[in-house]
Amino acid sequence: MEHFATGSIETHKDSQRKWIRDKGPVVESNMGWIEVYIDPENIRAYFEGWVAIVDKAKSEKFQKLVQNSEQVIPLLPWPKQMEKDHFLAPDFTTLEVIAFATDSCPLGINIPNYDDIRDNEGFKNVFLGNSAKSYAISAMQFATEEQSKILSDNTPRCYEVHVACHELLGHGVGKLIYRGADGKIPHAFVDPVTGESFESCYEQGEDWNGKFGPISTSYEECRADTCGFYLCTLREVHTLFGFDGDNEHEIKTMLWVNVMNQFRKGILGLQMYNRETSKWGQAHTWGAYVFS
Protein backbone atom coordinates (compact mmCIF):
# COMPACT_ATOMS: atom_id res chain seq x y z
CA MET A 1 0.00 0.00 0.00
CA GLU A 2 2.89 2.34 0.72
CA HIS A 3 4.10 1.84 -2.87
CA PHE A 4 0.69 2.74 -4.29
CA ALA A 5 0.48 5.80 -2.03
CA THR A 6 3.98 7.12 -2.75
CA GLY A 7 4.97 5.62 -6.11
CA SER A 8 8.29 4.56 -4.60
CA ILE A 9 9.97 1.85 -6.69
CA GLU A 10 12.17 0.86 -3.74
CA THR A 11 9.07 0.13 -1.69
CA HIS A 12 7.73 -2.16 -4.41
CA LYS A 13 11.12 -3.88 -4.68
CA ASP A 14 11.01 -4.56 -0.95
CA SER A 15 7.58 -6.16 -1.36
CA GLN A 16 8.98 -8.43 -4.08
CA ARG A 17 11.88 -9.45 -1.84
CA LYS A 18 9.41 -10.53 0.83
CA TRP A 19 7.33 -12.35 -1.80
CA ILE A 20 10.18 -14.49 -3.13
CA ARG A 21 11.19 -15.43 0.42
CA ASP A 22 7.68 -16.74 1.10
CA LYS A 23 8.29 -20.35 0.04
CA GLY A 24 5.50 -22.90 -0.38
CA PRO A 25 2.44 -20.82 0.59
CA VAL A 26 -1.13 -22.09 0.27
CA VAL A 27 -2.37 -18.80 -1.20
CA GLU A 28 -0.29 -16.79 -3.68
CA SER A 29 -0.85 -13.16 -4.64
CA ASN A 30 1.05 -10.30 -6.19
CA MET A 31 0.27 -6.92 -7.70
CA GLY A 32 1.81 -3.83 -9.15
CA TRP A 33 2.86 -2.31 -12.46
CA ILE A 34 4.83 -5.36 -13.50
CA GLU A 35 5.23 -5.88 -17.25
CA VAL A 36 5.95 -3.52 -20.15
CA TYR A 37 4.88 -5.97 -22.86
CA ILE A 38 2.11 -3.86 -24.38
CA ASP A 39 4.12 -0.63 -24.55
CA PRO A 40 5.94 -0.41 -27.92
CA GLU A 41 8.72 1.55 -26.20
CA ASN A 42 9.08 -1.02 -23.37
CA ILE A 43 8.94 1.70 -20.72
CA ARG A 44 5.41 1.97 -19.27
CA ALA A 45 4.34 -1.04 -17.24
CA TYR A 46 0.69 -2.02 -16.93
CA PHE A 47 -1.09 -3.01 -13.74
CA GLU A 48 -1.77 -6.58 -12.80
CA GLY A 49 -2.99 -8.09 -9.56
CA TRP A 50 -3.90 -11.68 -8.88
CA VAL A 51 -4.89 -14.13 -6.17
CA ALA A 52 -4.58 -17.90 -6.55
CA ILE A 53 -4.61 -21.18 -4.64
CA VAL A 54 -1.52 -23.40 -4.85
CA ASP A 55 -2.15 -26.91 -6.20
CA LYS A 56 0.34 -28.84 -4.07
CA ALA A 57 -0.03 -32.15 -5.92
CA LYS A 58 0.45 -30.72 -9.43
CA SER A 59 3.33 -28.54 -8.20
CA GLU A 60 5.48 -31.61 -7.47
CA LYS A 61 6.57 -32.07 -11.11
CA PHE A 62 7.65 -28.42 -11.32
CA GLN A 63 9.63 -28.77 -8.12
CA LYS A 64 11.37 -31.80 -9.66
CA LEU A 65 12.51 -29.57 -12.52
CA VAL A 66 13.83 -27.03 -10.00
CA GLN A 67 15.64 -29.77 -8.08
CA ASN A 68 17.25 -31.06 -11.28
CA SER A 69 17.99 -27.64 -12.76
CA GLU A 70 21.71 -27.73 -11.97
CA GLN A 71 22.00 -30.93 -14.02
CA VAL A 72 19.84 -29.57 -16.86
CA ILE A 73 21.38 -26.10 -17.27
CA PRO A 74 24.77 -27.43 -18.54
CA LEU A 75 22.87 -29.12 -21.40
CA LEU A 76 22.05 -25.72 -22.92
CA PRO A 77 24.13 -25.05 -26.06
CA TRP A 78 26.36 -22.21 -24.88
CA PRO A 79 29.50 -21.79 -22.75
CA LYS A 80 29.12 -22.33 -19.01
CA GLN A 81 30.77 -18.96 -18.39
CA MET A 82 27.59 -17.32 -19.69
CA GLU A 83 25.63 -18.76 -16.75
CA LYS A 84 25.27 -17.39 -13.24
CA ASP A 85 27.94 -18.58 -10.82
CA HIS A 86 25.20 -20.05 -8.65
CA PHE A 87 21.65 -20.86 -9.77
CA LEU A 88 19.25 -19.46 -7.17
CA ALA A 89 16.63 -22.23 -7.12
CA PRO A 90 13.21 -20.54 -7.02
CA ASP A 91 9.79 -21.62 -5.83
CA PHE A 92 7.85 -23.15 -8.76
CA THR A 93 4.19 -23.96 -8.21
CA THR A 94 0.99 -24.69 -10.11
CA LEU A 95 -1.82 -22.27 -9.28
CA GLU A 96 -5.56 -22.24 -9.69
CA VAL A 97 -6.33 -18.58 -10.32
CA ILE A 98 -9.23 -17.08 -8.38
CA ALA A 99 -8.95 -13.57 -9.81
CA PHE A 100 -6.53 -11.90 -12.21
CA ALA A 101 -6.94 -8.16 -12.82
CA THR A 102 -5.14 -7.24 -16.03
CA ASP A 103 -5.63 -7.14 -19.80
CA SER A 104 -5.07 -10.91 -20.24
CA CYS A 105 -4.16 -13.96 -18.17
CA PRO A 106 -0.83 -15.62 -19.08
CA LEU A 107 0.07 -19.31 -18.75
CA GLY A 108 3.15 -18.75 -16.64
CA ILE A 109 4.83 -15.98 -14.70
CA ASN A 110 8.50 -15.40 -13.83
CA ILE A 111 8.96 -12.36 -11.57
CA PRO A 112 10.17 -9.99 -10.18
CA ASN A 113 11.64 -8.25 -13.22
CA TYR A 114 14.18 -6.21 -11.26
CA ASP A 115 17.55 -7.54 -12.50
CA ASP A 116 19.39 -6.75 -9.27
CA ILE A 117 16.90 -8.84 -7.27
CA ARG A 118 16.80 -11.66 -9.85
CA ASP A 119 20.59 -11.96 -10.03
CA ASN A 120 21.36 -11.67 -6.33
CA GLU A 121 18.25 -12.76 -4.42
CA GLY A 122 16.19 -14.90 -6.77
CA PHE A 123 12.73 -15.03 -8.33
CA LYS A 124 9.56 -17.12 -8.40
CA ASN A 125 7.87 -19.13 -11.13
CA VAL A 126 4.19 -19.99 -11.25
CA PHE A 127 2.17 -22.01 -13.77
CA LEU A 128 -1.48 -20.98 -14.06
CA GLY A 129 -3.26 -24.30 -14.38
CA ASN A 130 -6.81 -23.15 -15.10
CA SER A 131 -5.52 -20.58 -17.60
CA ALA A 132 -3.81 -23.42 -19.47
CA LYS A 133 -7.12 -25.29 -19.73
CA SER A 134 -8.77 -22.39 -21.54
CA TYR A 135 -5.71 -22.06 -23.78
CA ALA A 136 -6.08 -25.69 -24.88
CA ILE A 137 -9.67 -25.07 -25.93
CA SER A 138 -8.69 -22.08 -28.07
CA ALA A 139 -5.76 -23.89 -29.67
CA MET A 140 -8.00 -25.46 -32.32
CA GLN A 141 -7.90 -22.47 -34.68
CA PHE A 142 -6.10 -22.78 -38.03
CA ALA A 143 -5.96 -26.60 -37.77
CA THR A 144 -7.47 -29.46 -39.76
CA GLU A 145 -9.90 -31.85 -38.08
CA GLU A 146 -7.15 -34.43 -37.59
CA GLN A 147 -4.74 -31.84 -36.20
CA SER A 148 -7.45 -30.46 -33.91
CA LYS A 149 -7.90 -33.92 -32.37
CA ILE A 150 -4.17 -34.23 -31.67
CA LEU A 151 -4.01 -30.71 -30.23
CA SER A 152 -7.12 -31.22 -28.10
CA ASP A 153 -5.80 -34.47 -26.65
CA ASN A 154 -2.24 -33.32 -26.01
CA THR A 155 -1.95 -29.53 -25.57
CA PRO A 156 -2.42 -29.32 -21.76
CA ARG A 157 0.17 -31.98 -21.01
CA CYS A 158 2.69 -31.06 -23.72
CA TYR A 159 2.56 -27.29 -23.39
CA GLU A 160 2.99 -27.64 -19.64
CA VAL A 161 6.55 -28.89 -20.24
CA HIS A 162 7.30 -26.01 -22.61
CA VAL A 163 5.94 -23.36 -20.23
CA ALA A 164 7.91 -24.86 -17.33
CA CYS A 165 11.17 -24.75 -19.30
CA HIS A 166 10.32 -21.31 -20.74
CA GLU A 167 9.79 -19.76 -17.32
CA LEU A 168 12.39 -21.52 -15.15
CA LEU A 169 15.24 -22.16 -17.56
CA GLY A 170 14.41 -19.68 -20.32
CA HIS A 171 13.95 -16.52 -18.29
CA GLY A 172 15.86 -17.88 -15.31
CA VAL A 173 19.28 -18.64 -16.78
CA GLY A 174 22.11 -16.60 -18.22
CA LYS A 175 23.79 -13.41 -17.07
CA LEU A 176 24.97 -10.16 -18.60
CA ILE A 177 28.72 -10.09 -19.24
CA TYR A 178 30.38 -6.76 -18.45
CA ARG A 179 33.78 -5.51 -19.56
CA GLY A 180 36.28 -5.53 -16.71
CA ALA A 181 38.05 -2.50 -15.24
CA ASP A 182 41.08 -3.43 -17.35
CA GLY A 183 39.00 -3.02 -20.51
CA LYS A 184 38.96 -6.74 -21.28
CA ILE A 185 36.13 -9.24 -21.60
CA PRO A 186 36.39 -11.39 -18.45
CA HIS A 187 36.14 -14.72 -20.29
CA ALA A 188 37.29 -15.99 -23.67
CA PHE A 189 33.82 -16.69 -25.07
CA VAL A 190 33.39 -18.62 -28.29
CA ASP A 191 30.24 -18.35 -30.41
CA PRO A 192 28.78 -21.91 -30.42
CA VAL A 193 27.45 -21.37 -33.97
CA THR A 194 30.40 -19.75 -35.76
CA GLY A 195 33.25 -20.85 -33.51
CA GLU A 196 34.56 -17.27 -33.46
CA SER A 197 35.50 -15.38 -30.31
CA PHE A 198 33.19 -12.66 -29.03
CA GLU A 199 34.73 -9.20 -29.21
CA SER A 200 31.99 -7.17 -27.50
CA CYS A 201 30.09 -7.23 -24.23
CA TYR A 202 28.13 -4.89 -21.95
CA GLU A 203 29.86 -1.74 -20.81
CA GLN A 204 29.48 -0.55 -17.23
CA GLY A 205 26.10 1.14 -16.71
CA GLU A 206 24.42 -0.68 -19.61
CA ASP A 207 21.59 -3.16 -19.24
CA TRP A 208 19.43 -5.42 -21.42
CA ASN A 209 16.51 -3.04 -21.94
CA GLY A 210 18.74 -0.06 -22.58
CA LYS A 211 20.88 -1.95 -25.07
CA PHE A 212 18.09 -3.50 -27.13
CA GLY A 213 15.40 -0.85 -26.63
CA PRO A 214 12.03 -1.55 -28.32
CA ILE A 215 12.93 -5.16 -29.17
CA SER A 216 14.30 -6.10 -25.73
CA THR A 217 11.23 -7.79 -24.26
CA SER A 218 10.36 -9.64 -27.48
CA TYR A 219 13.98 -10.72 -27.82
CA GLU A 220 13.83 -12.07 -24.27
CA GLU A 221 10.63 -13.99 -25.06
CA CYS A 222 12.31 -15.53 -28.12
CA ARG A 223 15.20 -16.60 -25.90
CA ALA A 224 12.86 -18.20 -23.37
CA ASP A 225 10.76 -19.89 -26.06
CA THR A 226 13.72 -21.42 -27.87
CA CYS A 227 15.03 -22.71 -24.53
CA GLY A 228 11.63 -24.28 -23.92
CA PHE A 229 11.45 -26.00 -27.31
CA TYR A 230 15.01 -27.29 -27.03
CA LEU A 231 14.79 -28.53 -23.45
CA CYS A 232 11.43 -30.27 -23.76
CA THR A 233 13.02 -32.74 -26.21
CA LEU A 234 15.66 -33.84 -23.68
CA ARG A 235 15.11 -37.06 -21.74
CA GLU A 236 16.49 -35.39 -18.61
CA VAL A 237 13.56 -32.95 -18.77
CA HIS A 238 10.46 -34.58 -20.25
CA THR A 239 10.72 -37.70 -18.08
CA LEU A 240 10.25 -35.43 -15.04
CA PHE A 241 6.77 -34.68 -16.42
CA GLY A 242 5.79 -38.31 -16.96
CA PHE A 243 6.77 -38.71 -20.62
CA ASP A 244 8.34 -41.98 -21.77
CA GLY A 245 11.84 -41.15 -22.96
CA ASP A 246 11.93 -44.34 -25.04
CA ASN A 247 8.68 -43.56 -26.87
CA GLU A 248 9.88 -41.66 -29.93
CA HIS A 249 6.33 -41.06 -31.20
CA GLU A 250 5.27 -39.50 -27.89
CA ILE A 251 8.25 -37.13 -27.86
CA LYS A 252 7.75 -36.12 -31.51
CA THR A 253 4.06 -35.47 -30.79
CA MET A 254 4.99 -33.26 -27.84
CA LEU A 255 7.37 -31.15 -29.91
CA TRP A 256 4.85 -30.92 -32.79
CA VAL A 257 2.05 -29.83 -30.44
CA ASN A 258 4.24 -27.19 -28.82
CA VAL A 259 5.50 -25.80 -32.13
CA MET A 260 1.99 -25.75 -33.63
CA ASN A 261 0.71 -23.80 -30.64
CA GLN A 262 3.55 -21.34 -31.15
CA PHE A 263 2.64 -20.91 -34.83
CA ARG A 264 -0.96 -20.25 -33.81
CA LYS A 265 0.18 -17.63 -31.31
CA GLY A 266 2.28 -15.97 -34.00
CA ILE A 267 -0.68 -15.79 -36.40
CA LEU A 268 -3.01 -14.41 -33.73
CA GLY A 269 -0.29 -11.96 -32.80
CA LEU A 270 -0.92 -10.07 -36.03
CA GLN A 271 -3.90 -8.55 -34.21
CA MET A 272 -1.36 -6.68 -32.09
CA TYR A 273 0.56 -5.27 -35.05
CA ASN A 274 -0.04 -1.65 -36.03
CA ARG A 275 0.51 -1.24 -39.77
CA GLU A 276 0.53 2.56 -39.55
CA THR A 277 3.39 2.71 -37.06
CA SER A 278 5.00 -0.64 -37.98
CA LYS A 279 5.05 -1.54 -34.29
CA TRP A 280 3.86 -4.48 -32.23
CA GLY A 281 1.69 -4.00 -29.17
CA GLN A 282 2.69 -7.15 -27.32
CA ALA A 283 6.12 -8.72 -26.76
CA HIS A 284 5.05 -12.37 -26.58
CA THR A 285 3.13 -12.24 -29.85
CA TRP A 286 5.93 -10.41 -31.66
CA GLY A 287 8.37 -13.04 -30.44
CA ALA A 288 6.00 -15.83 -31.51
CA TYR A 289 5.58 -14.24 -34.95
CA VAL A 290 9.36 -14.02 -35.42
CA PHE A 291 9.67 -17.65 -34.37
CA SER A 292 6.89 -18.66 -36.77
Where in this protein do the model-derived segments appear?
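Contiguous, non-catalytic segments that form substrate-binding/exosite surfaces or channel walls
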Residues: 1-159
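Glycine- and acidic
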Residues: 51, 141-158, 181, 204-217, ...
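Secondary-structure transition/capping motifs at alpha-helix termini
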Residues: 171-183, 234-242
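Long, well-structured alpha-helical subdomains associated
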Residues: 208-211, 215-222, 226-292
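Short, glycine-/Ser/Thr-/acidic-enriched flexible segments
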Residues: 105, 114, 133, 168-170, ...
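Short alpha-helix carrying the canonical HExxH Zn2+-binding catalytic motif
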Residues: 156-169
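Post-HEXXH active-site segment of zinc metalloproteases
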Residues: 174-221
